Amino acid sequence: VQASETDDLKTLIYFGVRDTESQEDDIIESCKIKNYRVHEMRHRGFEVCIQEVLTKLTEVDMIYITFDVDALDCDLVSYGTGTPVSKGFDIEEVVMIIKGIQSTGKVVALEVCEINPLLDHKGNRMAEAAFEVIDSIF
């Protein structure tokens, strides 16, 4: 990643990324991308972490949210995603994060990705969980 490209990443924020490769870790570190880890948010408090995010995004005109369902705890919800990893967020926590960001009035899009019903050992539970999140925030 070149220095000129890192300016575009200053407002990129991750929540709950838990399964990365060393190359990804290097980019996250070198570009100073904040990853709010699940245990960090639970320890520090969701409100505190979300307020930090809102402060960081004050100069941003538009916010685009990608909700990758593998941020959800696969043991609590489902393995119906490309990268099922335990110790993730529960549905209520994801809703809290998205609603907090929505409170800015700057969210222009919400993308939901990584649902894979072929890997879902609970029927179509991961898709149902995604719909629960969407239903709760709109």
What are these regions (language model features)?
Residues V1-F138:
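Conserved alpha-helical scaffold segments that buttress catalytic/binding sites
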